[in-house]
Structures are given as C-alpha cells and as structure tokens.
C-alpha cells in the first residue's frame, strides 16, 4: 500500500501551498516509506508516498503518459496489468509499475475504463490538457480513500482522513465502486454487479467452480517483487489462503526471486486458540512459521496509536485491529512488505455465527449483501490500515471480483446453516476444498468453527479491554453520553473510552460521521438483530455474544434432527468432484 494526497483547484500555487501539501503528505508516510513524489500543475497537486512492491527501482509516482499531459497518483495493485499492456501496444510505458496502465487506459478510453482494472486501488488522475480530473476507488473499498472540500472551492482526496481533516470544511469516506469526475460534476457508480440489488440468485452450487475461482484469486496475488507471507490464524479462511498459496507458489515468479518457502505469521496471547491452531496448520503445510505473543497490557498501551491509524471508534474494529497492528510491526522488522489475508469470506458466505439464525435464504442473502457493502467501514479498513501503519501491504483474495461474482451467484439455499445435514457456517467453501486425494487441510481444521480475530487471539483480550475502560469511564460519564456525544452515542464504557480518544485526534463532525453506528450482535448489521429477540439484550460485537450458536448448539441441533428423522437421513448435497 501507498499513501496518496491530491488537492485540485485550490487557487494557490505559491511555495507556501506546496510546503503545506508536502507537510500533509508526510502524515501518510507510514503507508509508503520508500519514496515521496509530488506533481504540481498550476493550482493542482498530486502527492505520493510509495511502498515499493512492483518494480521497486523505477516505479516511483506520480506516473504519467508519454508526454506527461496525464498524471496519476495511485495506491493499489493492478493484477491484470500485463494483460492490459498487451492491449496498449501503441503506448510507450516509462516504468514496470503495474499502476502505469491507468494513465494509458485513460488516454485510450477516457473515463470508461475503471471496470477493466482487476485489483485493489484508489487513484486520482489529472488531465492537464483541460485541467479535468477523476478519482476512483476499487469495487469493495479494500483500499481506503477520502474526499473533502475546502472553503476555496478545492477538492481533496487522501488515503487517510488525517491528511485532509484539518484543511477541509467537509469530508467523507469515498464510496467504494465509484468514480468522481470533474467533467460530469460528481460521483457515479462504476461497479454494478448482479448481486448489488440484493435479488436472490438461483445458480446451483458447483464446488469445483468455487474452488477454481478462489485458487485463481490467490494466484493473482502472488505478484510481487518483494518478500511476502500469509497471515495464518489457523481458522478456515487464513488456512485456505496459506494452503492454496503454497500449492501454487513454486510455479510463480515470486518463487524464482525469493524461493518456494512460504512464511506464515500469527499473533495471540499466551495459550490463545489462534496460536495453537496456526501452529498446527503451519506444521501440516510445512511453512516457515512466525509466532508473536503479546500481553493485554501491550495491547492497551497501543490503543491510542491504533485509533489514530485506523481512524475509527467502532468497538469491533479496534479490538481486532490492535493485535494486527502489533503483528504488522513485527512482520516489517523481518523484512516482509506484503502479506495475504483472509478477510471477506464471512461476509460473502455467511460465516459469522449469527447467520445460524437466518430465517430463510432471502434474508440470509440480503444480509450478506449488506455486509459486503459495509466491508470498507470495518474489516477492509482494519486489514489495510493496521498493516499500512508499518509499511506492510495486505492483499485479500476472498474479495477478488471474479470470486465474488461466483460466490454471490450461488443460490443461498446452499449457504444456509443446517446442522441436521452436517452443514455448519461456510459449508460451501469447506466442501469445495474437501479433497480426499490431495487434501488441502486436515478435516478438523477444514471444519473448525468460526472465531472472530479479536476472540481467537485470546478471550482475555476483550475482557482486559473492558476492565481498562471501566477504570477510565465512570457511571456518571456513561449516563451523560448522549449529551457529550449526541451523534452515534456510545452505549458501553468501552465504546465511550474509544470515542474520547478518537475525538482527540479527529474533532470535526465530518470525522465522526465516517464511522457507522447502530446495534450489532456478533458483527451483524442492525437488520439482522431482528432475527432473535434475545439479542437486543446483549449487543456485544464479540462472536461470543451469539450465545447458543457455538459447537454445543450444533451438536444439540444435529441430535434433535437425527432423533426426529430416524437413521435414514441422507445428505442430498453435492460432494466435491461429483
């Protein structure tokens, strides 16, 4: 990941303004410590802080077309850049950067090229021939981007809020899957997949199609000119990422540069579920595994810094971001600049424990759609900013556009959790990789139940955070919360504590509006809380809050179903390879 800042139409091309842009861009340097670039054209500025992953020697930004009339500052990775270059043979490229294709695609197609990009990205492009500009963000919002407006009529774009919040009167999170065009006067959606309107799909489940789509997604993300690894908690998602990456690493260009030994990384409190499971998977796969232990106090000491970098006061996100933030620092110290991570699977496939309560396939599917649309405010934000705080890039194969299209086209009847048929959450994914001849993972790992990252690193982590917040927030403070924080009022002492830290760094109302609110149970949307009347009394975002939906509940449901149906119960669903 890199850091970008663009200021356009600020009616000021003085040296003082240039110095201010450099100062603000410096706030993003943790994202891109390798090099800094600045392009100025009259009263327009494009700044860039580079993390060099592809073509480290010549890919400095901003990037240009042949005559430098088009300039672009990009934060992202374009996985199909070689294919796109083949379609642009009449163009002369200056670098080997994957992102340079953006300038040339604009020359060739105008503004209608964004959907041709396969990757994660946020960019701002300036056409100096008419001083027009566009900005765009990837389909799901893997890559962060904010847009702001100055009193002088200027439009601002930045990878993180901290680079524009002081100088903009109003700002907001740039919506995923959108393009901003100065010519057309605002935002419009470029990403319009079939699932976006939330209509229930009807494609039958084919395990091999799903498996192949995910393998392709992982293979794409092995594109790197620097050392990389995989974040491995030992849960289903990270274990599959590691297993697939290892299976295809030897034939990749990355292996020719860095060898075929895969590095994996895990963090947790002493004796945590993730450390144990991660070690077991690493031993099975034969990876070079790196374990990092932290204490509750280590995490508490980092909370302020985490909130500054993550730019949220959402309880779930902060709980999960803190260990990831600590781990990323350790990873960077080992010389690793890119990691693969397992975000997105739970949203796409209904992996959170509360999906057990979905009343029917329609509501199940609609909830997955809502969760995917909100990913940029939660898991994408965490994965990107926790790692980028230390100059590490996180890639998320489950959010590959093609894999998403395949997974979201499956009739959700196949995704429903049905213990009587042996189907726990994400059964369609588990079954797709249940290969008897060439196993990807041991059975008990392949069918390990979901743990939220903040739970899996050790249950005492969340309890420690609550205890710490209780010491800093009194009953009186919480009772007056609606007066102190009338917008998105915190309902717990932990939420109040995080909010006070956030407001210290980001005091403007526009900043607090970038953080979503509303009731949630075990990471659900507010709508899904309606699925179980008891949840409204226990709105803790931890996975443990979905009481009665853990392993014991599954066993009870299966036993009850077996007793009811007798011994002739047959699972009619397709097995992998049939």
UniProtKB/Swiss-Prot annotation:
This is Asparagine synthetase [glutamine-hydrolyzing] 2. SUPFAM superfamilies: Adenine nucleotide alpha hydrolases-like, N-terminal nucleophile aminohydrolases (Ntn hydrolases). The active site is at 2 (for gatase activity). Its EC number is 6.3.5.4. The record marks 343 as: Important for beta-aspartyl-AMP intermediate formation. Disruption phenotype: Pale green leaf phenotype and reduction of biomass in mature plants. Increased levels of asparagine, proline and ammonium in response to salt treatment. The keyword ATP-binding applies. Essential for nitrogen assimilation, distribution and remobilization within the plant via the phloem. GO terms for biological process: ammonium ion metabolic process; hyperosmotic salinity response; L-asparagine biosynthetic process. L-glutamine binds at residues 50-54, 75-77, 98. It is an enzyme of class 6 (ligase). It holds the Pfam family Asn_synthase. Pathway: Amino-acid biosynthesis; L-asparagine biosynthesis. Residues 2-185 form the Glutamine amidotransferase type-2 domain. Induction: By light and sucrose. Down-regulated by dark.
